[in-house]
């Protein structure tokens, strides 16, 4: 807050403390123009001397007031520095939140990419299962044929008799060939099963790792959200305090304007009563109040003197 606003606020408080009740009491004691009477010149000079003494005391009070104003201005400057530091801290925190949002977006993109890779591996696993099922069917078919060939020896003999085979060993060789084919098929099926098991193990490890990463990111996001909520609550509190300070300053400025206007009106009335030229600025409220106080004090003293003389005359 600026120095001008501080001076106006404390000046209003000063007017209220120094002149509020005393000015009202003096005005109540002040007699009407018709009831006034001329006083001796000597008495008037004495009253002016007393007024000068009072004016000197007022000047001392003004100096005390100015020292108080300087102290308050230093305090307000410190408050302004702290306010600037708070705004800078809030700006840095907002930048920190923005950077963490960008990190979260990158983490989500990475998680989406990992999920797509997981789906691709699942498709590969399903394809391997289908191939394995086909191999099993082929194995079953060949096993059934082998069983048929090994059981019926007579049938083999008849086959030798009625076919191009001349000996049973040729049929056996044919059988061994089929057995070898069966072995190869079984080995291929086993290798396919091992591939499936390895793929399942890799998939389980990958899923566990990604679940841990997602949990860590969620915990980090929750912690950052809590810090953000606390910072936002602090910002709301400081904004409310700042609005209260601005409203209070506006009210005091309005009160000060009213006091200055009333002082100026009263000063103009006093100037008319004095019927002499006064060289006081319209903005110099302090000097206007000093002249008003001096005028009222003079009139009060004159009135007291008149009352005293009237009482003496009545007693005589």
From Swiss-Prot:
Subcellular localization, as worded in the UniProt entry: Cytoplasm, Perinuclear region; Cytoplasm, Cytoskeleton; Cell projection, Cilium, Flagellum; Cytoplasm, Cytoskeleton, Microtubule organizing center, Centrosome
GO biological process: acrosome assembly; centrosome cycle; cilium assembly; spermatid development
Record-linked InterPro entries: CFAP_domain-containing, DUF4200
Keywords, in A-Z order: Cell projection, Cilium, Coiled coil, Cytoplasm, Cytoskeleton, Differentiation, Flagellum, Spermatogenesis
UniProt key word Cytoplasm: yes
Coiled coil: 43-151, 182-236
CC terms in the record's Gene Ontology section: centrosome; manchette; perinuclear region of cytoplasm; sperm head-tail coupling apparatus; sperm principal piece
Pfam families per the UniProt record, alphabetical: DUF4200
Quaternary state and interactors: Interacts with ODF1 and ODF2. Interacts with CCDC38. Interacts with CCDC146. Interacts with CFAP53.
Function, as annotated: Essential for male fertility. Required for sperm development.
Protein family membership: Belongs to the CFAP73 family.
Protein name, per record: Coiled-coil domain-containing protein 42
Species whose genome carries this gene: Bos taurus
């Amino acid at each position: 807050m600026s120095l001008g606003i501080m001076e106006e606020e404390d000046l209003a408080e000063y007017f209220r403390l120094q002149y509020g009740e005393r000015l009202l009491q003096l005005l109540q004691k002040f007699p009407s123009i018709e009831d006034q009477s001329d006083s001796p010149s000597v008495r008037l000079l004495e009253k002016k001397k007393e007024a000068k003494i009072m004016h000197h005391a007022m000047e001392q009070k003004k100096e005390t007031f100015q020292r108080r104003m300087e102290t308050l201005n230093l305090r307000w400057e410190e408050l302004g520095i702290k306010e600037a530091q708070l705004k800078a801290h809030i700006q840095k925190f907002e930048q920190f939140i923005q950077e963490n949002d960008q990190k979260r977006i990158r983490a989500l993109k990475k998680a989406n990419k990992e999920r797509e890779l997981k789906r691709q591996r699942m498709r590969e696993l399903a394809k391997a299962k289908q191939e394995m099922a086909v191999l099993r069917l082929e194995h079953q078919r060949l096993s059934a044929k082998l069983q048929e060939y090994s059981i019926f020896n007579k049938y083999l003999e008849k086959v030798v008799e009625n076919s191009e085979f001349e000996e049973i060993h040729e049929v056996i060789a044919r059988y061994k060939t089929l057995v070898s084919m069966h072995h190869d098929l079984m080995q291929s099926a086993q290798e396919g099963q091992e591939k499936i098991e390895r793929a399942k193990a890799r998939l389980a490890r990958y899923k566990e790792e990604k679940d841990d990463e997602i949990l860590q990111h969620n915990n980090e996001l929750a912690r950052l959200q809590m810090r953000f909520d606390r910072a936002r609550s602090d910002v709301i509190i400081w904004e409310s305090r700042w609005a209260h300070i601005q409203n209070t300053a506006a009210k005091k400025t309005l009160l000060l304007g009213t006091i200055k206007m009333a002082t100026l009106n009263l000063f103009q009335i006093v100037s008319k009563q004095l019927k002499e030229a006064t060289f006081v600025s319209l903005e110099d409220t302090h000097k206007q109040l000093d002249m008003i106080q001096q005028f009222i004090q003079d009139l009060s003293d004159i009135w007291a003197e008149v009352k005293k003389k009237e009482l003496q005359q009545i007693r005589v």
